[in-house]
């Protein structure tokens, strides 16, 4: 069997939204890699239809590549992606009427929410969050807590928001003086 790829996503502290796109369009960029994968699958399939060297190593390598890409691509349910984008944006505090506004009209804090939405929608195996509550209101923090608790993914959080950390953790890892201490407890129980 092939080794499992681990996808790690990180919420940067700098803005990556592009001016010119609406909030909804920018958030849909979370799925850009899937469109690229689909294009690559189509390109390989076209190449396979014109090749006649069915027994060659190159042909077999293309078959393996298109199979692996297809398996990855079709494992992701894209049928409801617009609903997922809407639900995530609403959860992070956007109003429906703001979905079609350009991202350039929003402050840095709201653009960070767009980046957080994109990150959550990518559905990575490991989610690294650096101060994710900095630009969120109470309702959005509550939504994010629920999202993380309902997720089956590993989440690594760096935060000064003790209540948030306590509400989402089941395990606390302390890194001190080059050593790692693992506590199977919420943050408040660790203290």
Question: Can you annotate each of these PLM segments?
Answer:
Residues 1-191:
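ABC ATP-binding cassette signature C-motif
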